[in-house]
Structures are given as C-alpha cells and as structure tokens.
Amino acid sequence: MNAPRCLRRLLERQWRQGGWLSTLLRPLAALTGLVVARKRNAYLTGARAAWRAPVPVVVVGNIYVGGTGKTPVVIEVVRQLQARGWTPGVVSRGYGVDVGAAPRVGQGQLAAADYGDEPALIARATGAAIAVHPHRPRAVQALLRAHPGVDVVVSDDGLQHLALARDVEIVVQDERGVGNGRLLPAGPLREPAQRLADVDAIVTNAGRPRAAAAPAAGAPRQLAMWLEPTHAQRVTDGATRTLADLAALPPARLAAAAGIGNPARFFQTLEQAGIRPAHTLALPDHYAYAQSPFTALDADLILVTAKDAIKCAALDDPRLWAVQVGTRLSDPDFGDWLSATLRARQP
C-alpha cells in the first residue's frame, strides 16, 4: 500500500475517533474556524450581500467533508416537489468539469463529461433542468433564463455557498455524524458542529430502515434515509435482472465496484439485499473510467452504481450491470412539510 493511501486512512480514522495526528493539526483547524466564521458573519451582518432568486431555493449539503449521500437526497427532494405540483430546477458546481465563464444548462440524458457525475445522474433520474457553474447565483440566473417555468431551485452541495440566499437548508449526514467534532484538517468538518442547529432539516443516511425522530420545537426536522435496490440494468443494452436473480448467483461469479464518496456503503447495500459479491473494487470518487479497471476481475457480472454506469457505458463491457435504487425516508410527511415551508416563506 502506498504512503499517501496509508496517511489518508490514518487521517480518516482520526477524523472519527481523534488521536495524535488530529491533535497535532488543531492549530490549522483553528485557522479554518476563523475563515469560516468570518465569511459567515459577513453574510449574516450584511457586509456581503447574498443574491436572492425570484423563486424559492432549497439547499442540500453537508458539513462532513466527502460523501454522505447528498445526491440521493437531492433526487428525492426534486421528486417530492414534483409530486406536489412544483417545477424544480437544480444547480450544481459541476465537479471535475471545466464549465468556463458561462453556466452550462441542460436537461435529460446529460453527459457526465460535460456536466459532472452528480448533475448528469440527477438530470437522468428526475428529468429536471440542470445548470452547472461554481458561482451558484450565476447558475440560478442561467437556469431561470433557459427554463422560465422553474418555480423552485434545489442547490446541490450548496450549504457553504452563502452568496446564494436560501429558504430551506437540508443537511445530509451518515452514521459518522460529526466524527471527532473538529474542523478540517484536524477533523472532517467544513463548519462547526453547532451549524446543525441553524438548518431546517437533518437527513441521516442510515444505510438501513430506521424510525423518524420525534420533532422538537425549534429544532431541525430529523429523519433517516436509506437506499433500497430495486433491480439491475445492463449498461450496454438496458436488459434487466431482479435482485432475487442476482442473490441466487454464486458469489464467485459476482463482483462489485464503486467510484463514489463512500464505496463501502454501496457494498453494504448489496449485502443487505442478499447479494454478496466475491470481489469488490473501491475506486476514487469521480473516477473517470478513461481505461477499464475491470480487466483483471474474474467475474461474469460486475455490479456498479448508477452514477458510475453513466461513465462506464463507453467501456462497452457486457458484464457491467447498474444497480438501480430507490430512496426511502423515515418521515412520510417530509414532502408535505417541505412544500408547505416553501409556500410559507414565499413573499
């Protein structure tokens, strides 16, 4: 194992539990805290003005760096709003894509190379219009010009983008919670843990069914989210197989791969569905698939995430099957609450 990977794993362990390296990095974390507080206070006091869109804005983000499950929550938020008569559009940074000066706006079967992994997946899953650009207000403006029927904007991974005023803030976390509670680089947090008290809802990616927490007066709405696989779809031709079919296959015939923020969560989801591949391949988040990483895998079927499948199509490997999942929420009233909150906060 190479040195950078060993250091990364050590740091991730200490981000969860604390330790000597985390303690050593606390002075740098203090600097992070000063920068974060200064930026936030500038917007809270009006020293820096946040741009307010002519339509409501829902922000979905996290304070724990890396993958916590934001994309499935964005997709579910869009679907919940669509089911209640809204026409949502989505803005995102377009990670890994050189967007240029002008925002890029699209809809439907978008290419990850042009829009980024998450925006392409969100567009395909929801049909919503998407705009990508690092400057969120500029992305919203371009989105509304191109799609004037959009009446609510969902900002993907937008919690720290304070230049865009928001009406609802939703934080996504997973079983790691706030880890050791320290800011980067001594801990995993982009903002202090106290920031959670200011948001409207906290969605915990629980990995498995969990009851919703009873709402407390004045506190953020608390709910759990988990993913349930529904079926698998072959990347090359769209053929489908049931989960029962996959679970009945000998594990030696199966492999699974994921290039997402937390590959272990995908493998855990498969295991909970009774699918236990003999081989698993954890790839870096936003893996480009410029070359196939599967040539050495001795398997008849290779299961990948829907996000990976968008880029894997160019490999033309008939062994690749995308596991399609549905997002489940512990709070059956979440969509009604979100819609009512947005309408109540409209001018």
From Swiss-Prot:
PANTHER family given in the database record: TETRAACYLDISACCHARIDE 4'-KINASE, TETRAACYLDISACCHARIDE 4'-KINASE, MITOCHONDRIAL-RELATED
One GO CC term, this protein: plasma membrane
Entry-linked InterPro entries: LpxK, P-loop_NTPase
Biological or metabolic pathway of the protein: Glycolipid biosynthesis; lipid IV(A) biosynthesis; lipid IV(A) from (3R)-3-hydroxytetradecanoyl-[acyl-carrier-protein] and UDP-N-acetyl-alpha-D-glucosamine: step 6/6
Chain residues that bind ATP: Y64, V65, G66, G67, T68, G69, K70, T71
Organism in which the protein naturally occurs: Bordetella parapertussis (strain 12822 / ATCC BAA-587 / NCTC 13253)
Cited HAMAP family: LpxK (MF_00409)
Main EC class the enzyme belongs to: transferase
Biological processes annotated in GO: lipid A biosynthetic process; lipopolysaccharide core region biosynthetic process
Keywords from the UniProt entry: ATP-binding, Kinase, Lipid A biosynthesis, Lipid biosynthesis, Lipid metabolism, Nucleotide-binding, Transferase
Transmembrane segments: none
Catalytic activity: a lipid A disaccharide + ATP = a lipid IVA + ADP + H(+)
Protein name: Tetraacyldisaccharide 4'-kinase
Protein family (similarity comment): Belongs to the LpxK family.
UniProt-listed Enzyme Commission number(s): 2.7.1.130
Domain of life: Bacteria
Function per UniProt: Transfers the gamma-phosphate of ATP to the 4'-position of a tetraacyldisaccharide 1-phosphate intermediate (termed DS-1-P) to form tetraacyldisaccharide 1,4'-bis-phosphate (lipid IVA).
MF terms (GO), sorted A to Z: ATP binding; tetraacyldisaccharide 4'-kinase activity
